[in-house]
């Protein structure tokens, strides 16, 4: 995590998940090797019931990070909880391949597109999340699983 120019923290509305996410960020911000200017930290709210709940998850984490760590995090978006996502998890397959028209699969596409768009303006992040998502979408579009 310290070597990455981007960190994507995936959390859920459950209190234990928020606590774990904050603990990770706390250890990151307090590490002397962590470079705040070089690292972009984003939060993805996963398995939420609404866009408002997703934003609320981010707001809670952002408040404590700002107040106690004097840090900055951005909102990467949200992935809704739906039956297709639950089924894909049980089958151990990506929901974007298992049920590409589901709400959660579409949300993953929106989040990936926004992360890629944000990276195009940040040239120094050329080995960050855009590279990861570019490879995934290329494989998906070519039909490779």
Residue ranges and their predicted role:
Residues 1-77:
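Conserved catalytic-core segment of NTP-binding enzymes
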Residues 23, 84, 103:
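Residue-level recognition of oxygen-bearing side chains
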Residues 33-37, 56-58, 86-93, 110, ...:
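A general structural signal for short secondary-structure boundary/capping elements
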Residues 44-46, 91-98:
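Short hinge/gating elements
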Residues 64, 68, 82, 114, ...:
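Phosphate/oxyanion-binding loops and surfaces in catalytic or ligand/nucleic-acid-binding neighborhoods
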Residues 68-95, 108:
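Beta-strand-loop-alpha "switch" segments that mediate conformational coupling across diverse proteins
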Residues 94-145:
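NTP-binding/hydrolysis catalytic cores, primarily Walker-type P-loop NTPases
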């Amino acid at each position: 995590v310290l070597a990455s120019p981007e960190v994507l923290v995936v959390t859920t509305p459950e209190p234990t998940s928020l606590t774990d996410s904050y603990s990770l960020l706390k250890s990151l911000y307090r590490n002397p090797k962590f470079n705040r200017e070089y690292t972009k930290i984003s939060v993805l709210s996963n398995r939420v019931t609404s866009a408002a709940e997703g934003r609320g998850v981010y707001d809670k984490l952002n408040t404590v990070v700002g107040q106690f760590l004097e840090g900055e995090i951005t909102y990467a978006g949200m992935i809704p909880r739906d039956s297709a996502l639950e089924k894909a998890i049980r089958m151990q397959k990506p929901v974007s391949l298992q049920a590409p028209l589901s709400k959660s699969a579409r949300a993953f596409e929106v989040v990936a597109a926004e992360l890629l768009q944000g990276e195009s303006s940040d040239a120094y992040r050329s080995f960050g999340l855009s590279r990861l998502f570019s490879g995934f979408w290329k494989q998906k579009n070519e039909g490779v699983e």
